[in-house]
Amino acid sequence: MIRLFRLTTGEDLIGTPDQDTTTDDFQGIKQPFVLIPMQGEPGKPMKIGFHPYIPYTQDKVIKIKKANIITETTPDNNMINAYQQNTGQLVTPPKAKIITWL
């Protein structure tokens, strides 16, 4: 399950918790990305950039000290889809709705 993490540094990370590397002191996160707010064009909504948390590592799981995690939340569907696109995962399509005409 993809989760959002806010760190004591103010960074927001998105990734998948990894139970195999999580300990009492460390939270393992698979493919963590830092969310970077980016100013769009004037009058347009702000955009979110996705950047690898530690771009120069070959490791797929990064361990973060639990003491440095302020909170953990569930991202909205748009954020999940954007993360899946950035990590090469299949994007979950929205649930189909049936429309009937009377």
What are these regions (language model features)?
Residues 1-102:
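Conserved RNA-binding domains used in RNP assembly and mRNA/RNA metabolism
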